[in-house]
Amino acid sequence: MARDEVRRILPADIKREVIVKDDKAETNPKWGFPPDKRPIELHIQYGVINLDKPPGPTSHEVVAWIKRILNLEKAGHGGTLDPKVSGVLPVALERATRVVQALLPAGKEYVALMHLHGDVPEDKIRAVMKEFEGEIIQRPPLRSAVKRRLRTRKVYYIEILEIDGRDVLFRVGVEAGTYIRSLIHHIGLALGVGAHMAELRRTRSGPFKEDETLVTLHDLVDYYHFWKEDGIEEYIRKAIQPMEKAVEHLPKIWIKDSAVAAVAHGANLTVPGIVKLNAGIKKGDLVAIMTLKDELVALGKAMMSTQEMIERSKGIAVDVEKVFMPRDWYPKLW
């Protein structure tokens, strides 16, 4: 069966132009640690794992296992997967734990197996499922951890992969907080026969995909052993991504070395500290503040648009909400 031609684009795939405000600014190589050059201990402390969650355990249990495997105090996951669901589960470690907030606007992708409760012609299945692209209204399932209020969610694309009788295998890209089980239930109602979700796997969570960075719990056990027992850090380094991976999709503002320590101490970012920034930033957007070495300094809410940040010479550009940069990586220069 030929696959439908579908453009599979999530918010995380948006390409952003970079606008330079200060073309004379440089960074001192003595300060900070470029994401790919951190000592292994810091790499782990400021890292994120692209985990292939197995079906069976809860997301919380999987995170607890990772903490035991890697001997960590803190870890957090980005987007809960139900016990029976497998696939991409970003797990942020130690000092990077709060970076999972950045994944909320990035979009998610799943491959689902829908079982119809009656026979339906293929052309009708395709036509009806196409109608579910765009904004839909959902109520969280009874067993959900959130209040069961009606809410709007966006379906970015639906791609039918295979139809075999009453079984429909499809790929779907959705906004965070979209319930695929509920989506399938409503598709079944629209088809007039009813349907239920037979299987589900998450294949993307923003910048985290089913690619060479995806690792299993067994991989982590082996790689940690290689490092601790044999002194081989190559594998654990590949298994853990720098926390900057989790903000790849966000609009960014790069700042001067002289502004880094102030933001690391919790100060809001002011316009004079900006070197370059992405086009299209709107007031209220979640933005990532970066060093000129592409280190994540903080997340915050834009208080100006890109145009205003370029044109103005003073004022608060970003209300800083979460700081990730240690206070001692860059010197106080204020």
UniProtKB/Swiss-Prot annotation:
Gene3D superfamilies: Pseudouridine synthase (3.30.2350.10), PUA domain (2.30.130.10). One of its GO terms (biological process) is tRNA pseudouridine synthesis. It comes from the Archaea. PROSITE patterns: PUA. The keyword Magnesium does not apply. It catalyses: uridine(55) in tRNA = pseudouridine(55) in tRNA. Keywords: Isomerase, tRNA processing. It is an enzyme of class 5 (isomerase). Residues 250-325 form the PUA domain. The keyword Transmembrane does not apply. The active site is at D82. Could be responsible for synthesis of pseudouridine from uracil-55 in the psi GC loop of transfer RNAs. This is Probable tRNA pseudouridine synthase B. It comes from Pyrococcus abyssi (strain GE5 / Orsay). The gene is truB.
